[in-house]
């Protein structure tokens, strides 16, 4: 089972990865760049480079940024199951005929998998979501790691969901609150990184 929308999660993981470097997009085969990283509060994990929509907005809104990459961790069991599903065609996104009707295999699979919201009471452990920044400050190379650690069970007690939904929903709720209060207010459609972070 996935801890977020299964269709979106499986599409992200099985799709080619990409990252922004030197003013253009670089595409790589799915899951082809893997790093081992020691995450604060979580420990050593394998992380894989994926394409994610956040990096599109960051590349567009941070002038002169040299490189932006997005990594996500996955256990070997998850990856093995995903590869089996891919091998038998269950991650296909094109319609196929089945018993006289058209179905999209990945959408059918989503209907069979548990609703991620139902997994909150039994999800244990912690998440670590962060950004590693490297660059030059005052003529010297500098590296900064900003991160957030959330405990699945603490999140569930607070809002009735596991930490993945919590860390997705809370920033969106804060942004909505800032718009409702008029602190973030300009005509058009914008991503959060285009607004004042300290209203």
What are these regions (language model features)?
Residues 1-199:
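C-terminal catalytic/substrate-binding lobe primarily of soluble NAD(P)-dependent oxidoreductases
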